[in-house]
Amino acid sequence: MHHYTENHVFCENENIAVVFHPAHNEEIHIHDFVELVYIAGGRGHQYIDGKKYSVMRGDMLFINLNHTHAFTTDKGMEYYNIYLKPGFISSELINADNAMQMLTLTAFEDFRETVGEESPVVRFSGGEMAEVESCLSAMLREYEHKENGTGTVLQSYLMILLTYVFRKMAAFGGVQPGENGNKIGDLIQYIEENCTQKLSLTELSEQCFYNPSYF
């Protein structure tokens, strides 16, 4: 099984990488960074930790680090990849307003139980899909041109994109506990066990993105 490291996708001093892929298959692999996948055209199948998902245009999946991932294409599937360094998420993207939403985004297994086992994390359609694709297209152009301030612009676009994701998650009522528990429950337990200490957002986010016991 291939292991993608940060050096495979990030240039020096980059925290976000954006790539558009034409149709091709990818064997099972893992990576030590966070990945957002958006299906921009066609159809295919994504496999995350051995579970198969039929995907089509408008679908977005969240793949945390150290999860196994593979996919096959059908009918010319095209897709965007957004790669994020975990340390960047915990230090730059999480703030007091979006902390719980960002942390619940890591609970992929629990959220898919809410929307159905065959569903991806979120599915956009109509005007929502057009807005998401416009945002992704702008991110790709910005990343490829790499002008002054590209990092700031990409972070701004990413927050817009994640806001669309949060809205879609909220439409399903958020993450619900599954039969096997969930990362949010574990996170709450961690907070309770350390309630006498001052906990930072970085420390809390690391419970989802870094601690191997949370995968």
Per-range role (PLM):
Residues 1-62, 66-76, 98-123:
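Generic protein-terminus/edge-of-domain signal
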Residues 128-131, 179-187:
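N-terminal positioning helix adjacent to the helix-turn-helix/winged-helix DNA-binding module
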Residues 116-175:
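An amphipathic alpha-helical interaction segment
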Residues 40, 133-144, 188, 192-195:
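Regular secondary-structure segments
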Residues 162-170, 190-215:
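Basic/polar phosphate-binding segments, predominantly the helix-turn-helix DNA-binding elements
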Residues 76-97:
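A short hydrophobic beta-strand segment most commonly corresponding to one strand
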